[in-house]
């Protein structure tokens, strides 16, 4: 088993040492968490600039950290990790495998890349940007499939419909934007 023990940190500068650079945000830490777990790791370590330093008032933080670590525990990414945990605990762990063959056609590059994991009767596909995806529903049991969107930032579930086996295009109605991340959930009907 593997774990990503040090991915990016929420609110740390992209270039690490230049505090004037853009900072990694909640959608960035979610991306690394979902990519890691859907690729087959047994877990993920959340990181936050202020929390990792246990930054206290009156102390100058490294990497541009400004807020006390207790306050950083209210940052969005910190509180959004529970939605990944809840999703993964909903489905059997020991039969789940990473399976990119569920993604038909071109998968995309860099942040546009979708990642899939499945069990015998369910399929989960994480999409960071909301781009259209061609998904092969024949890899899990059943001739009819039920599908939902799961919103990574708040855990909301939205029923999409029932589909026959085959390849279908899915795109979340909120459009194609970086950080517009959702999980397509498909189960045997």
Q: Where on the chain are the PLM-derived regions?
A:
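Active-site clefts of carbohydrate-active enzymes
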Residues: 1-27
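Aromatic- and carboxylate-lined catalytic core of secreted/periplasmic carbohydrate-active enzymes
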Residues: 10-12, 25-161, 173-189
């Amino acid at each position: 088993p593997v774990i990503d023990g040090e991915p990016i940190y929420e609110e740390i500068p992209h270039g690490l040492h230049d505090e004037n650079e853009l900072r990694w945000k909640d959608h960035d830490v979610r991306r690394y968490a979902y990519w890691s777990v859907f690729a087959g790791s047994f877990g993920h370590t959340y990181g936050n600039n202020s929390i990792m330093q246990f930054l206290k008032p009156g102390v100058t933080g490294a990497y541009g950290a400004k807020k006390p670590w207790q306050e950083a525990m209210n940052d969005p990414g910190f509180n959004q990790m529970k939605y990944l945990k809840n999703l993964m605990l909903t489905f059997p762990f020991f039969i789940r495998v990473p399976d990119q063959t569920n993604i038909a056609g071109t998968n995309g590059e860099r942040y546009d890349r979708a990642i899939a994991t499945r069990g015998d009767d369910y399929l989960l596909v994480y999409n960071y940007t909301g781009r259209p995806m061609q998904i092969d529903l024949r890899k899990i049991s059943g001739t009819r499939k039920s599908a939902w969107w799961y919103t990574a930032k708040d855990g909301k579930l939205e029923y999409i419909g029932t589909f026959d086996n085959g390849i279908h295009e899915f795109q979340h109605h909120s459009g194609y934007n970086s950080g517009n991340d959702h999980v397509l959930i498909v189960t045997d009907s």
